[in-house]
Amino acid sequence: YPKSKNIIKNVNRDIFRFVNHKPEISSIIDAIAHPFAAGNFYYFIHYSTHAEFSFVSDSIKNVLGYNKEDFTPGFLAKILHPDDKNQFGDKELISLSFLKKQISVNDISSYKLAFLLRMKHANGKYITLLHQARPIRVSEAGEILETIYVHTDISYLNVSVDNRVSLISKNNHSQISIDATKNQLLPPNCFMKNFSSR
């Protein structure tokens, strides 16, 4: 059973590495995923040991109006709504803490976290995004090494951003909602820490 989970983890990792080097595959993934998405979306991949994102999908132009080459961790921090900056870090901290303390190492990559945030579009207006993140590579010690993030524009739903973060497991069909109201220091593997002080 653990061996099959490692195979699945490696397949996930290899798919995203392949997409990173084959833009036409990225287009196919976008075409398949789009009908099932709640709105227009883009995705990006981050290695916890690197300062920059390793991949950003072309569809960011349709969602936020920016070129993918301009979308860096520092730029993401710059276009976050001022009221959401602390919440973003708090929500990520709570999620990472939950995964490290409550979930076995083999199950970490089966969870995704989801919450709402606002980002400034190139036209100057803020849009509401559903932020989803899923670890795609985890060390034997349980450190998250690589994560895929998906941002979906849900502005048309007229929802308000709150302190809630949801953790959803694909294996046991469970969902946990947490109120992320504590303001704590971010752990070193949280990419928000790397650019929140810039």
Predicted regions and their residues:
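Per-ARNT-Sim (PAS) sensory domains and their PAS-associated C-terminal
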Residues: 99, 103-133
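Short loop/turn elements at sensory-signaling interfaces that couple input to output
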Residues: 2-3, 132-147, 155-161
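Histidine/lysine/aspartate-rich catalytic loop segments that bind and position anionic ligands
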Residues: 154-176
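PAS/GAF/H-NOX family sensory domains and closely associated sensor/linker modules
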Residues: 76-100
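Short, low-complexity N-terminal regulatory "tails/caps" that precede and couple sensory modules
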Residues: 1-19
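Sensory beta-strand/linker motifs that couple input domains to effectors
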Residues: 150
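PAS-family sensory domain signal
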Residues: 20-75, 169-185
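Helix-turn-helix DNA-binding segment
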Residues: 178-198
